[in-house]
Swiss-Prot record:
GO BP of this protein: cell division; chromosome segregation; positive regulation of chemotaxis
Origin superkingdom: Eukaryota
Phosphothreonine PTM positions: T194
Region Disordered, residue ranges: 495-693, 747-858
PANTHER family given in the database record: CAMK FAMILY PROTEIN KINASE, SERINE_THREONINE-PROTEIN KINASE NEK1
Entry's family note: Belongs to the protein kinase superfamily. CAMK Ser/Thr protein kinase family.
Protein's job: Protein kinase that plays an important role in mitotic regulation.
Name used for this protein in its record: G2-specific protein kinase nim-1
Organism: Neurospora crassa (strain ATCC 24698 / 74-OR23-1A / CBS 708.71 / DSM 1257 / FGSC 987)
Biased composition (Low complexity): 636-648, 676-691, 781-802
One of the record's GO molecular function terms: ATP binding
Bias (Acidic residues): 526-535
Enzyme class: transferase
Entry-linked SMART domains: S_TKc
């Protein structure tokens, strides 16, 4: 890459005798330079030597008031020489003078002094080869330092071509002395003998062909300052000769009045004809005004330098600020990245640590859980090991010694408890003739509380009791629970058992999983109901709903109706079903009573004293429903006592021999008599009566009251406060079948026939009549049909034989005015009424009904 390619050509700024001056820009740093293009193809040898001397001098001169020289470029192909020098933006001093002439203005004196002082300083550097001394503190005078001695062997440079066109001005009006093409380098003691300059600025010694000395440049300096002030040269003529003559005379015109005399005097000193009288550059520098100008120039230079430095520093500061901001941004980004990296790393570490601790804690809790489960399993296994066991038939065995001693804090039965865990459900075919002699089968009876639901294994620990379907209570009552209605609000508190263990009713896991033990078929016939004081416990069944405030399956918001639990048993339960040791004892006792009933008179004392003479429960409440069975039983006991004192036992034997005794769960059957004997017994009834005894017909109806259940309306009325016994009897009498009335009345006639001779006439008191309350239309039709059937049968059988009644008389025997009510060989009779939804048929099996002919023959 050539030197010319490193610069960018901008414009042409002038031309000279040797070439063209152009303005260029350096591409490296953008610096503006001045290129002087000189073609030495047509130069003579002397001119080539002068050109060589110029760039040699410029290369050694380095001063602020001298045009700077950078380098040269020699183009051999075109024989051109390019000199790159400092660029002066304001042109030269000759253009300034032309502008003043053009504008008809005078230059300011301060400007003139500034140009003068700078030219003196530049000439001082050329004449003495050193820079002039600084003003410093010697503003008022340079002293001995004003005239320095040139260094030995130094070079003295004579410009020899000072003119306004060779004085250049910078942007700040700084003077730059240039164009040293005609300069001559000579020793300090040498003098130049040739003059090659402009004739308007040549000194008198040059005109006189004398030698050229340093004082010649001072003359040229005076001519330039005078032309700047007067806008014309000091010496001017039309011909060369006249010009030389005027120069030798040395007379000049005064300066315009705008300038000071000091300036004119200084110019006159410089234009003295005698060179020895001219001041040198050192003397000129010592002038007060020059010192001030120099000092001012120094201040300006200093301010410019300071401003430049400030700009440089500001630029540097801005660069540093930008770099600092970039560094801060980079630092923040790096820190954010490091923080994010550290955060991620610590989050990962924390997550791992948390996971480890969580896993450790989970493992610890799992171990604790397994240990706890193992401990509870062992405890349950130990408890199951000493809990109740079940045999192959599903019967519950005896509890362990620990569980047997635990007694529940409340009674779980709604009607009391029997001898065993389950009541006897056997019929007459299951009764054993042999009397059980094992005393261990009979356990102590536990006092009952009324209207409590049964819960099995109540004495077992709470941890081992689990929930069963028996403890489930539906949200809405189903029809199956109407059989156990308890409509009185006063019975609600004692109806529900406080369930402390809302779990499975079985404390231990049964050994047998036979589901047939709990699937008990429902009885289609009416179930017996007796006195509530002698009621027995219900058979535990999973289908029954436990009314308990602590039942977890009960609905809190919906309260079911109070229930009156009735005793229901099935007569078709297999023999090998759920049985207990107490059941066997009950069967043997029942058969023993039946075996002797046909041979001995019927008495109240011998009929199951263990069942009759039970102590009343201390926690039992008295029912507000009148107990008809209890009244009949007390009247029967009085009649039996009367007959045992003075009468014969034949009538009682006759009556009791015809009674078919059934255990609990079967239908009751009284003496089976034909219609004729019944009518005859009614006609021959003794009229002798006790004041406290009710009529015979009422007793029969009262005894038969336990056959059929009450209607829903009557139950509501009974729970609300009860009805009179007479109204109940009169209303219930129409609901009985004819055969049921006949059997009960026949037994009463046979027992009272022996007293007909002593009393003279039989008195049949009429039962108190009350207006019946029909329930439905079908119920009224049924009453009318039953009444018609009763009348027709009574009239058709009124002529029957009286053999049955004749057998009841005896001499010396006290007659029993009231018939003896059948004594039911049961352990407990309940007063609770059966469900009205269970219809009891009046048809009896043929095996239980004895024909009338057989009765008369016996």
């Amino acid at each position: 890459m050539s030197e010319s390619d490193k610069y960018e050509l901008l414009e042409k700024i002038g031309h000279g005798s040797f070439g063209i001056i152009r303005k260029v820009r350096r591409k490296a740093d953008g610096m503006i330079l001045c290129r002087k293009e000189i073609s030495y193809l047509k130069m003579s040898q002397k001119e080539r030597e002068q050109l060589h001397a110029e760039f040699s001098i410029l290369s050694t001169l380095r001063h602020p008031n001298i045009v700077g020289y950078y380098h040269r470029e020699h183009l051999k192909a075109t024989q051109d020489l390019h000199l790159y020098m400092e660029y002066c933006g304001n042109g030269d001093l000759g253009r300034v003078i032309r502008n003043l002439i053009k504008n008809n203005q005078y230059a300011e004196e301060s400007f003139v002094w500034s140009i003068f002082s700078q030219l003196v300083t530049a000439l001082y550097r050329c004449h003495y080869g050193v820079d002039p001394p600084e003003v410093g503190k010697t503003v008022l005078g340079l002293g001995s330092t004003a005239r320095p001695k040139p260094p030995s062997g130094g070079m003295t440079i004579l410009h020899r071509d000072l003119k306004p066109e060779n004085v250049f001005l910078g942007e700040d009006n700084s003077v730059k002395l240039g164009d040293f093409g005609l300069s001559k380098v000579m020793q300090s003691h040498d003098f130049a003998s040739t003059y090659v300059g402009t004739p308007f600025y040549m000194s008198p010694e040059i005109c006189a062909a004398e030698k050229y000395t340093l004082k010649s440049d001072i003359w040229s300096l005076g001519c330039i300052i005078y032309e700047l002030c007067a806008r014309e040269p000091p010496f001017n003529a039309k011909t060369h000769y006249q010009l030389v003559q005027k120069i030798k005379e040395g007379k000049i015109a005064p300066l315009p009045s705008v300038y000071s005399g000091e300036l004119f005097a200084t110019i006159k000193d410089c234009l003295r004809v005698n060179p020895d009288r001219r001041p040198d550059t050192a003397t000129l520098l010592n002038l007060p005004i020059v010192r001030l100008m120099r000092k001012e120039k120094e201040v300006v230079e200093f301010s410019r330098t300071l401003r430049t430095k400030e700009e440089t520093l500001n630029k540097r500061i801005r660069e540093l600020d930008s770099k600092l901001s970039a560094l801060e941004t980079e630092k923040s980004s790096i820190r954010a990245e490091i923080d994010a990296s550290l955060r991620r790393e610590w989050e990962v570490k924390a997550r791992l640590e948390i996971d480890r601790l969580v896993a450790q804690e989970i493992e610890s809790l799992q171990q604790k859980f397994e240990q706890e489960v193992q401990a509870r399993v062992e405890a349950e296994l130990q408890r199951h090991g000493r809990g109740p066991m079940f045999n192959s038939h599903g019967q519950q065995g005896s509890f362990s010694s620990t569980a047997a001693t635990l007694v529940s804090d409340y009674n779980l039965s709604s009607v009391g408890s029997g001898d065993g865990d389950f009541p006897s459900t056997t019929d007459i075919t299951d009764i054993s003739i042999a009397e059980s002699t094992d005393g261990s089968d009979i356990t102590k009876k536990i006092p009952r509380t009324p209207f409590h639901r049964a819960q099995t294994y109540s004495s077992a620990p709470a941890e081992s009791v689990l929930g069963t379907p028996m403890d489930i209570e539906m949200a809405s009552p189903s029809p199956i629970t109407i059989a156990s209605l308890s409509l009185s609000p006063r019975r609600m508190a004692l109806t529900k058992a406080p369930t402390t263990n809302p779990r499975m009713i079985f404390g231990e896991e049964p050994t047998s999983t036979d589901k047939s033990n709990w699937e008990v078929p429902r009885e289609t016939e009416m179930i017996d109901s007796g006195d509530e004081s002698e009621a027995e416990a219900l058979v535990p069944s999973p289908k029954r709903i436990t009314k308990s405030s602590k039942n977890p399956f009960s609905t809190v918001t919906t309260r079911s109706r109070p229930s009156l639990n009735s005793q229901q048993n099935s007569n078709v339960l297999p023999i090998h079903g759920l049985r207990s040791k107490q059941t066997l004892a009950t069967r043997s006792k029942t058969v023993s009573g039946v075996s002797s009933i046909g041979q001995h008179p019927l008495r109240s004392a011998p009929s199951a004293p263990s069942l009759r003479d039970r102590k009343p429960s201390p926690t039992r409440r008295l029912s507000r429903i009148p107990s008809v069975t209890g009244v009949g039983r007390r009247l029967s006991a009085n009649n039996i006592n009367n007959s045992s004192n003075g009468g014969s036992d034949a009538p009682s034997s006759t009556v009791t021999s015809n009674i078919t005794v059934r255990t609990r769960g079967l239908k009751r059957m009284s003496s089976t008599c034909d219609e004729s004997s019944f009518s005859q017994q009614q006609n021959n009834q003794p009229q002798q009566s006790l004041p406290q005894a009710p009529p015979l017909k009422k007793i029969g109806l009262m005894a038969a009251k336990n056959i059929r259940g009450s209607s829903l309306v009557e139950l509501h009325q009974a729970r609300a406060g009860g009805r009179p016994i007479s109204a109940i009897i009169s209303n219930e009498a129409k609901l009985r079948a004819f055969k049921e009335h006949a059997t009960i009345a026949a037994s009463a006639v046979d027992s009272s026939s022996s007293s007909s001779s002593s009393s003279g006439q039989s008195q049949l008191p009429t039962r108190p009549r009350s207006q019946p309350q029909p329930i439905t239309a079908n119920f009224e039709q049924q009453q009318q049909q039953q009444q018609s059937n009763t009348n027709s049968i009574s009239s058709s059988n009124s002529a029957g034989s009286g053999s049955a009644t004749g057998t009841g008389t005896g001499a010396g025997t006290k007659s029993m005015p009231w018939p003896v009510a059948p004594v039911w060989n049961r352990e407990v009779e309940t007063e609770e009424m059966p469900s009205p939804f269970i219809v009891k048929t009046s048809k009896r099996p043929a095996s239980f009904v004895r024909p009338a002919s057989n009765l008369s023959q016996s």
